[in-house]
Swiss-Prot record:
It comes from the Eukaryota. This is Cyclin-T2. Residues 1-300 are annotated as: Interaction with MDFIC and MDFI. Regulatory subunit of the cyclin-dependent kinase pair (CDK9/cyclin T) complex, also called positive transcription elongation factor B (P-TEFB), which is proposed to facilitate the transition from abortive to production elongation by phosphorylating the CTD (carboxy-terminal domain) of the large subunit of RNA polymerase II (RNAP II). The activity of this complex is regulated by binding with 7SK snRNA. (Microbial infection) Promotes transcriptional activation of early and late herpes simplex virus 1/HHV-1 promoters. The lineage of its organism: Eukaryota, Metazoa, Chordata, Craniata, Vertebrata. It comes from Homo sapiens (Human).
Length: 730
């Protein structure tokens, strides 16, 4: 029970009181009394180590001993039995209780190392047992049952953390706090905060370090205890050094501490001290380790309600400010025997480690940190390119900008590596984005190829029209014997291959069917009507109307008047979008077992054995789907089709008026932009070809491509392609 702040002032004595102790009144000299106190403290230390109690328990027992002899004389109470009693009581207080039997045996072993172990049945053992129990009661009464002790070690740790002291300086200061209990009566004169400042001040002078003034203009000791002054620190430091001079045995142990530590097996930081204070805040966590001795630490630190201190810096050997030359000689003598700042008793296992090992350890830690900053940067790539790079780059922020280039280089190397495990990556998974200029160039090349094939297709269509002119009247009941695959399938397969390589859109382009019975005059009239309808649908497009404009209704009425055979136009529109990316007509053909790339007569194919009634019903469904596509696409893309006035309207005329068959082939129209919107994909595709006539004299062209539909990874890519396709004719 170490630190209960606000201890009673009855346990702080003046110098006059210390010179008038019960021992002094009994004739004991001052030096003799101090020597007895030091011997009792040494016995408590040795017993505590053998009993395996914490250093906190040992320090508490030493304070009990000092306070006890302020009310009792060494001549009446033997220091050895009082030491055992104090440790026995302190172990209980600090919750590390030891059996009375063990305490007596350990005390006997320390006092009589050459004698055999004490028998528990002998009279000496029973006598010591009775004495210890009685003395425990006397000690409790003497202490006034104030068993809570404040130690300066807590303040030493706080202050060294506050100023970000080095590990050596912190260890030296902490060790001097323990020595103050062993060698001096500071615990009877000053508060723990004052003793802590004295220990740090002495450690700084001993190791030639200086803690500079904080940014607030305050000295470091003012943050520990405002009542402390530099004069008081120098005075107590001088007194401490004089006590060390009077104890040559202790000074000899301090000088030989390094040799003893070198001979011992190096201990882990967590095993150096058994003190809970050290284990939690100093040794195990290595909080105070900031730099190697002589190297300035972090120039500032921040604490709540405190300001920043620059790091302690080494002093020159001639700048040690002491009161007289005698103290300077003591410092030089101690520094000669202990040139480093880590020193201590041979019996103390609580603290310091070897100076060289500590310095080597810190150098190694700094070197390891430097190497990690470069090695982790490369290790992350050895584990695979999918690992986040920022976890290895926190030491090297200047390398973050090189992330992309290094990663691309690594991907290239991994692809050509001999190892085909998880290290190698699969290139080409992410589709590449194309700029607008590249997209236009690619589309121009595709358009030229389509023009060449269009001439061949137009020649075949003209020949088919000449053969089928005589059979126009009986077109509804006669099946066409012609079944052929036109090269347009190859054209669209070529387009699909080109698009698949470039990683852009993959579309299915249905060729709008044509009717043969419409005249050129009717076509011109319908083009004008559709053109005016396009402007009206542009106004209504923002509302996404699902119904056609009045112009379209008028268009349908004219077609009903001129083509009585097309009565199925009055049927209601069916919403039958195909989500597989193919057209409705293509889906119907696939259901019938006919490849969609085959152009056939709408009435039926003789090879399939399909009756004319079933063919006409299939034709009716396709017309409804096409009409629905016409209305929905017109409302969705009013502005995107505005750039191609007559061409877009002519395509819409083809879609909305299936039953009309042209008697004469049309000249190739200019490049048109018509909308393809099947399933989830709606985009604009540039067509630079004339609509293809059907094979037979009464054939209705129903066609859909078999190119694959590619899903977009995000909406941004789709919008980019839409805008690129829209700007083709601008």
């Amino acid at each position: 029970m170490a630190s209960g702040r606000g201890a009673s002032s009855r346990w702080f004595f003046t110098r006059e009181q210390l010179e008038n102790t019960p021992s002094r009144r009994c004739g004991v000299e001052a030096d003799k009394e101090l020597s007895c106190r030091q011997q009792a403290a040494n016995l408590i230390q040795e017993m505590g180590q053998r009993l395996n109690v914490s250093q906190l328990t040992i320090n508490t027992a030493i304070v009990y001993m000092h306070r006890f002899y302020m009310h009792h004389s060494f001549t009446k109470f033997n220091k050895n039995i009082i030491s055992s009693t104090a440790l026995f009581l302190a172990a209980k207080v600090e919750e590390q209780a030891r059996k009375l039997e063990h305490v007596i045996k350990v005390a006997h072993a320390c006092l009589h190392p050459l004698e055999p172990l004490l028998d528990t049945k002998c009279d000496a053992y029973l006598q010591q047992t009775q004495e210890l129990v009685i003395l425990e009661t006397i000690m409790l009464q003497t202490l006034g049952f104030e068993i809570t002790i404040e130690h300066p070690h807590t303040d030493v740790v706080k202050c060294t953390q506050l100023v970000r002291a080095s590990k050596d300086l912190a260890q030296t200061s902490y060790f001097m706090a323990t020595n103050s209990l062993h060698l001096t009566t500071f615990c009877l004169q000053y508060k723990p905060t004052v003793i802590a400042c004295v220990c740090i001040h002495l450690a700084c002078k001993w190791s030639n370090w200086e803690i500079p003034v904080s940014t607030d203009g305050k000295h470091w000791w003012e943050y520990v205890d405002p009542t402390v002054t530099l004069e008081l620190l120098d005075e107590l430091t001088h007194e401490f050094l004089q006590i060390l001079e009077k104890t040559p045995n202790r000074l000899k142990k301090i000088r030989n501490w390094r040799a003893n530590q070198a001979a011992r097996k190096p201990k882990v930081d967590g095993q150096v001290s058994e003190t809970p204070l050290l284990g939690s805040s100093l040794v195990q966590n290595s909080i105070l380790v900031d730099s190697v001795t002589g190297v300035p630490t972090n120039p500032s630190f921040q604490k709540p309600s405190t300001s920043a201190f620059p790091a302690p810096v080494p002093l020159n050997s001639g700048n040690i400010s002491v009161q007289d030359s005698h103290t300077s000689d003591n410092l030089s003598m101690l520094a000669t025997g202990m040139p480093s700042t880590s020193y201590g008793l041979s019996s103390h296992q609580e603290w310091p480690q070897h100076q060289d090992s500590a310095r080597t350890e810190q150098l190694y830690s700094q070197k390891q940190e430097t190497s990690l900053s470069g090695s982790q940067y490369n290790i992350n790539f050895q584990q695979g390119p999918s690992i986040s790079l920022h976890s290895g780059l926190h030491h090297r922020p200047d390398k973050i900008s090189d992330h992309s280039s290094v990663k691309q280089e690594y991907t290239h190397k991994a692809g050509s590596s001999k190892h085909h495990g998880p290290i190698s990556t699969t290139p080409g998974i992410i589709p590449q984005k194309m700029s607008l200029d590249k997209y236009r160039e690619k589309r121009k090349l595709e358009t030229l190829d389509l023009d060449v094939r269009d001439h061949y297709i137009a020649a075949q269509v003209e020949q088919q029209h000449k053969q089928g002119q005589s059979q126009a009247a009986s077109s509804s009941s006669v099946t066409s014997p012609i079944k052929m695959k036109i090269p347009i399938a190859n054209t669209e397969k070529y387009m699909a291959d080109k698009k698949e390589k470039s990683g852009s859109l993959k579309l299915r382009i249905p060729i709008p069917p044509t009717d043969k019975s419409a005249s050129k005059e009717e076509l011109k009239m319908k083009i004008k009507v559709s053109s005016s309808e396009r402007h009206s649908s542009s106004d209504e497009g923002s509302g996404k109307s699902k119904h056609s404009s009045p112009h379209i209704s008028r268009d349908h009425k004219e077609k009903h008047k001129e083509h009585p055979s097309s009565r199925h136009h009055t049927s209601s529109h069916k919403h039958s979008h195909s989500h597989s990316g193919s057209s409705s007509g293509g889906s119907k053909h696939s259901a019938d077992g006919i490849p969609p790339t085959v152009l056939r007569s709408p009435v039926g194919l003789s090879s399939d054995g399909i009756s004319s009634s079933s063919s006409s019903s299939r034709k009716r469904l396709h017309v409804n789907d096409a009409s629905h596509n016409h209305h929905s696409k017109m409302s969705k893309s009013s502005k995107s089709s505005g750039s191609s006035s007559s061409s877009s309207s002519s395509v819409k005329q083809y879609i909305s008026s299936h039953n009309s068959v042209f008697n004469h082939p049309l000249p190739p129209p200019p490049p048109v932009t018509y909308q393809v919107g099947y399933g989830h994909l709606s985009t604009l595709v540039k067509l630079d070809k004339k609509p293809v006539e059907t094979n037979g004299p009464d054939a209705n062209h129903e066609y859909s491509t078999s190119s694959q539909h590619m899903d977009y990874k995000d909406t941004f890519d789709m919008l980019d392609s839409l805008l690129s396709a829209q700007g083709m004719n601008m």
